[in-house]
Amino acid sequence: MRSRSNLIGLINFFTFLLSIPILGGGIWLSSRANSTDCLRFLQWPLIIIGISIMVISLAGIAGACYQNKFLMWLYLFTMFFVIAALIGFTIFAYVVTDKGSGRFVMNRRYLDYYLNDYSGWLKDRVTDNGYWRDIGSCVRDSGVCKKIGRDLNGVPETAHMFYFRNLSPVESGCCKPPTDCGYTYVNETVWIPGGEMVGPNPDCMLWNNDQRLLCYQCSSCKAGVLGSLKKSWRKVSVINIVVVIILVIFYVIACAAYQNVKRMYNDEPVGEARMTNLILVIFKFKEILVQFFFGIVFLLLFNGLMVCCCNDKFAFSVFFFGYVTYA
C-alpha cells in the first residue's frame, strides 16, 4: 500500500510542477493586458486554474504522505473538474480567436488589419464602446507608438526601410493610417495626404498626426488589438493543450493507484490488485478519452447550430458551460 501511496504522491508532485506553466501563461497574459493586448479577461481564469491545481496537488501530496484516503479522494474529485475546466477554457480560446488575420499588402512586409475580417464574441467585446474606451486609452498609454520610431546612426528611418519592417498588429493598426488611404510617409507616426483614397475606408478620415490621437479610434486599431489578442491566446493555448494531455495521463494513473489503495484498505488479495492494475489503467484511460472526444464533437456541432440560429455570444456561452457540465 505504501508503494501505491508513494506513486500518488509522485504524480501529485509532477501535477504541481505542471501548474507552473499554466500560472506563468496567465501572468504573461496579464503583463500583455497592461501593455499591448489591453483586454483584461483571459488571464484571470488561467491564473485561478493554475493556483487551483497547485493547491489540489499539495492536498494530494499530503494525503499520499499521511496515507489519508479522504485527501486522495478529494484530489481526484476536484482535479477532474479542474481538468474539464481547463479543456473547456482552451477550446473556448480557440473558438473565439478562430476568424481574422492581417492582409498582405503589395510592396510591404507588414500586414494591414481590417475589422470586417473578424467576427464573433471577441470582436463584439473589443468594439463595444465602453470596452474600447478603456482599451484605446490602454494602447495609447502603453507608448507602443512612441517606441515605433527608429534611426540609423542618427539618421531617421526612410520610407523604404519602414515599409519592410515587421510591425506588430497594434503598431500596424494604431500607429499609422491604412495603406489603402494613400498617405505619404514623413516618419513612423506622421503621414500626409499623398493622393486620392483607394476605396471607401472611413479610417482615412480618422487618421490624425496629433500623437495623442493617431489612429486610436480607427477600426484598423481595433482589428490590430484583435490580431494581437489572437496571437497571445494561441500561444498560451498550445501550452495548455500539452499540459492537459499530461494531466489526463497522470489523472488516470492516479485513479488506478487509488483503486488499489482502496483494495488494500478493504483487505482484498494483493495479487488480484496487482493483476488488475494494468487493465484498470487501460480501461479508465480509454473511457476518459472516449468521453472527452464525443463530448467535444457533440458540443462543437451544437455550437455550430447555435451560431446559425442565435448570436455568437449566446452560442459560446452555451458551448463553454455545456462542455463543463458534460464532463
UniProtKB/Swiss-Prot annotation:
<dbReference type="Pfam" id="PF00335">
    <property type="entry name" value="Tetraspanin"/>
</dbReference>
<feature type="topological domain" description="Cytoplasmic">
    <location>
        <begin position="257"/>
        <end position="287"/>
    </location>
</feature>
<feature type="topological domain" description="Extracellular">
    <location>
        <begin position="97"/>
        <end position="235"/>
    </location>
</feature>
<keyword id="KW-1133">Transmembrane helix</keyword>
<dbReference type="GO" id="GO:0016020">
    <property type="term" value="C:membrane"/>
</dbReference>
<feature type="transmembrane region" description="Helical">
    <location>
        <begin position="288"/>
        <end position="308"/>
    </location>
</feature>
<feature type="transmembrane region" description="Helical">
    <location>
        <begin position="7"/>
        <end position="27"/>
    </location>
</feature>
<keyword id="KW-0325">Glycoprotein</keyword>
<feature type="topological domain" description="Extracellular">
    <location>
        <begin position="28"/>
        <end position="43"/>
    </location>
</feature>
<comment type="similarity">
    <text>Belongs to the tetraspanin (TM4SF) family.</text>
</comment>
<feature type="topological domain" description="Cytoplasmic">
    <location>
        <begin position="65"/>
        <end position="75"/>
    </location>
</feature>
<feature type="transmembrane region" description="Helical">
    <location>
        <begin position="76"/>
        <end position="96"/>
    </location>
</feature>
<dbReference type="GO" id="GO:0009734">
    <property type="term" value="P:auxin-activated signaling pathway"/>
</dbReference>
<feature type="topological domain" description="Cytoplasmic">
    <location>
        <begin position="1"/>
        <end position="6"/>
    </location>
</feature>
<feature type="transmembrane region" description="Helical">
    <location>
        <begin position="44"/>
        <end position="64"/>
    </location>
</feature>
<comment type="function">
    <text>May be involved in the regulation of cell differentiation.</text>
</comment>
<feature type="topological domain" description="Extracellular">
    <location>
        <begin position="309"/>
        <end position="327"/>
    </location>
</feature>
<feature type="transmembrane region" description="Helical">
    <location>
        <begin position="236"/>
        <end position="256"/>
    </location>
</feature>
<keyword id="KW-0812">Transmembrane</keyword>
<feature type="glycosylation site" description="N-linked (GlcNAc...) asparagine">
    <location>
        <position position="187"/>
    </location>
</feature>
<protein>
    <recommendedName>
        <fullName>Tetraspanin-4</fullName>
    </recommendedName>
</protein>
<feature type="glycosylation site" description="N-linked (GlcNAc...) asparagine">
    <location>
        <position position="34"/>
    </location>
</feature>
<keyword id="KW-0472">Membrane</keyword>
<dbReference type="InterPro" id="IPR044991">
    <property type="entry name" value="TET_plant"/>
</dbReference>
<dbReference type="InterPro" id="IPR018499">
    <property type="entry name" value="Tetraspanin/Peripherin"/>
</dbReference>
